[in-house]
Curated annotation (Swiss-Prot):
Organism name: Mus musculus (Mouse)
Similarity comment: Belongs to the pancreatic ribonuclease family.
Gene: Rnase12
Protein name per its UniProtKB record: Probable inactive ribonuclease-like protein 12
Compartments (UniProt record): Secreted
Signal peptide (from-to): 1-19
Length: 145
């Protein structure tokens, strides 16, 4: 009986670990900051470090975008009638938002390397382009100003 409880707890812990990894790489974790964090200075540097955003080979990401809209509003992009080939990958279909979203574009400052990545901040309004699956947005493919 004790062994069954231990096995159950191990399986439960393992399942939570797998689920946690999926959540950490979701579009919401990577790109959504709503309401916008009130970091007075160095917003991009803080957010990218806080969320551990980097390239797979651990280099600084050259450009990263944070969207300052409710997750529900971003989810609705997947029902947009504006469906098109993604600009970066013509094999994928993208959905474009029907309205412009508030965003912050973080552009890597030349000469900075991981983990001391430094970014220039550009607040913009633009239409987002996302890929979707049955559950909603999967990845931010870009934006159109």
């Amino acid at each position: 009986m004790v062994l069954m409880v231990v096995v159950f707890l191990l399986l439960l812990f393992w399942e939570n670990e797998l689920t946690e990894d999926v959540v950490l790489t979701s579009i919401e974790q990577l790109h959504v900051d709503y309401p916008q964090n009130a970091v007075p200075l160095r917003y991009c540097n803080y957010m990218i470090l806080q969320r551990v955003i980097r390239e797979p080979d651990h280099r600084c990401r050259k450009v990263h975008v944070f969207i300052h809209e409710r997750p529900q509003k971003i989810n609705r992009v997947c029902t947009s009638s504006k469906k098109m080939s993604c600009p970066n990958d013509s094999d994928l279909f993208c959905f474009q938002s029907e309205t412009k979203f508030r965003m912050t574009v973080c552009q890597l400052i030349d000469g900075t390397t991981y983990p001391a990545c430094r970014y220039q901040i550009s607040p913009i309004k633009g239409f987002v382009l996302v890929t979707c699956d049955d559950l909603g947005p999967v990845d931010l493919q870009g934006y159109v100003e």
